């Protein structure tokens, strides 16, 4: 059960939404936040910069006074659609009760760095608000799909092109009760972004979330899919080199943990990585551009879609792949030791429309604030 909680959002006004919105804060360096705050005084970056200086609550009050932000009079949920560069996300924005993250209903595939979690707590305390959302992926059923389609046919609160080029459309959820009931039938969800916002939660805390249907994440984007030539070989390799484990842990060097989704339910396995030279360190593989070869060696020849990565990036790199066929379903791989934290996402082909592949789920949700008051 995904416990959906309507909330009183502090959100941009239609007149100022373009000036407020930009990409998620973790995608910006401190210098970029400072530069953006100076250039766009009504932006989310300006609020974050003020919070870093200990003046977050005052800045939030001034944004309301300037009518850049308003707080809704009644609790509700929202539909938020974002389009940029041919990619589209449309999901439900709502509070989710914190115990769903601690009782195994919502699973996280990695742990947050301590400094990221600490910075998030400080930002939340200084603003008295959650200033960005946790991004969740879930398997949408027919009822939820129908409700989503009906919601986005209503008149939006606003439709703007933001400063980063993303188009944002926001609807107030007129069917909040129906959506809450429908999500009570969703048995599991998975954290795609925002792990550092989930530290030290109290059971009844509301967590601001954007819930994306997984078919939105597995969107049609790239034709570079490589179909596996020998599916049986992949399964033989997996059976010989993997074992199921109760929970992810800290495996020895040369091993990795993976979250395996079987019929929508998560399970964990541990498998052996190939020996050198195919098992070269992740740092070597990344810097030399041989990461594709390493991952193909792990999964078997022709099992992997062309991996996309940007060497030298400090943030977590999401590497996507698509396995056509197979009973295991989605696999989230956590290499250890984490020289550079990598995540490999793969999914069984029959779960996706023909011609589909994965793209990097950099979901921009800089429109959102959840005021605790």
PLM feature spans:
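Surface-exposed, charge/polar-rich loops and edge strands
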Residues: 1-373
């Amino acid at each position: 059960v995904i416990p959906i909680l309507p909330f009183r959002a502090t959100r941009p006004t239609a007149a100022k939404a373009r000036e407020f919105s930009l990409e998620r804060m973790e995608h910006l360096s401190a210098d970029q936040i400072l530069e953006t705050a100076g250039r766009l005084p009504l932006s989310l970056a300006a609020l974050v910069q003020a919070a870093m200086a200990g003046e977050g609550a005052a800045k939030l009050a001034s944004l309301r006074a300037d009518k850049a932000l308003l707080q809704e009079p009644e609790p509700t949920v929202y539909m938020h659609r974002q389009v940029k560069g041919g990619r589209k996300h449309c999901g439900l924005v709502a509070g989710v009760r914190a115990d769903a993250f601690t009782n195994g209903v919502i699973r996280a595939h990695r742990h947050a760095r301590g400094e990221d979690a600490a910075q998030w707590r400080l930002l939340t305390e200084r603003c008295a608000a959650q200033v960005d959302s946790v991004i969740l992926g879930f398997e949408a059923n027919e009822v939820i799909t129908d409700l989503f389609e009906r919601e986005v046919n209503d008149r939006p609160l606003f439709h703007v092109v933001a400063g980063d080029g993303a188009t944002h459309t926001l609807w107030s959820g007129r069917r909040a009760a129906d959506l809450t009931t429908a999500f009570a039938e969703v048995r599991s969800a998975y954290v795609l972004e925002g792990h550092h916002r989930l530290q030290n939660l109290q059971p009844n805390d509301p967590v601001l979330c954007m819930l994306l249907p997984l078919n939105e994440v597995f969107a049609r984007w790239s034709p570079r899919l490589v179909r596996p030539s020998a599916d049986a070989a992949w399964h033989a390799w997996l059976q010989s080199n993997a074992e199921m484990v109760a929970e992810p842990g800290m495996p020895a060097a040369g091993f990795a943990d993976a979250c395996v989704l079987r019929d929508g339910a998560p399970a964990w396995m541990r498998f052996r990585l190939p020996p050198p030279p195919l098992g070269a360190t992740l740092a070597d593989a990344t810097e030399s551009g041989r990461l594709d070869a390493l991952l193909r060696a792990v999964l078997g020849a022709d099992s992997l879609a062309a991996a996309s990565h940007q060497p030298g990036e400090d943030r977590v790199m999401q590497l996507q792949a698509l396995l056509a066929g197979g009973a295991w379903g989605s696999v989230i791989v956590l290499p250890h030791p984490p020289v550079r934290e990598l995540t490999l996402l793969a999914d069984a082909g029959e779960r996706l429309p023909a011609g589909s592949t994965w793209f990097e789920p950099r979901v921009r949700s800089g429109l959102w604030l959840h005021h605790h008051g």
